[in-house]
Amino acid sequence: MRAEWNPSASLARYNALAIRTPQGWEITEPGKQHLRNLGVTKLSPAAVHVATDLRAELAKLKNDSTRLFVEEAIKCYEAELYRSAIVMSWLAAVDVLHNHVHQNHLAAFNAEAKRVDGRWRDANTTDDLGRMAEADFLDRIVAISVIGKNVKKELKDCLDRRNGCGHPNSLKIGANTVAHHIEILLLNVFELL
C-alpha cells in the first residue's frame, strides 16, 4: 500500500524556507531566494539574462559607490521589486554620467551650463553636478558630445520612467519593462563610460 504524501509535514521540515500562517503555508524570503538559486523564478528567461548580464558588469565598475548602486538595483530586480530596480538603476546611471563628466569634460560642461544659464555656478565635484536637474544635465552633455541625441532620447525615457516609479501612483511595471530599462542603461551608460 502506498503512503499518502503529507505536504504540511514536508514543509514543516523546512521551517526557514516556509512558514505556516493562518491562511496556509507561505514561502519566506530565504525560501524565495533558495528557489531563485535553484532556477525556479517568475522572471522571464530574458529577465534572468539581463540580471546575469548586470552581475557581469559589476566587476567592470571602478567606482565603489556606483557598484553599490548597481548591485542594489540588481537585487531589487531579482526580488521582483521592479519600481525600486528602476529607481536604483537610474541613480547608478546618473552616478556614472556625473563621474565621467567630472573626470573628462568638466570645463566644457561648465562652459555650456553657463552659456544656457548665466546663473550657473561652476561645478567642481560630482555633487555639484547634482545641483542641475537631470533632464537639463542630459541636454548639456549632448551639447558637449558626451552622448548623442538618440542616446539622450532613450535616457530621457528612462528618466521619465524613473520619475513615474519614484513616487506613489497607479503605475504598474513588469519584469520586461524593467529588463528593457536596465538594458538601455547597460548598453548606453555602464558599458560605454
Label each PLM-derived region with a short phrase.
Residues M1-L61, L185, L192:
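Internal, Lys/Arg-enriched amphipathic helical interaction segments that engage polyanionic partners
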Residues H34, L43-V142, V146, K153, ...:
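Amphipathic alpha-helical interface elements
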Residues M1-R2, H105, S170:
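Residue-level recognition of short, structured coil/turn motifs
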Residues E4, A85-I86, K172-A175:
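Alpha-helix N-cap/helix-initiation sites
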Residues N15, R20-R36, A143-L193:
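Charge-enriched, short contiguous segments at helix-coil
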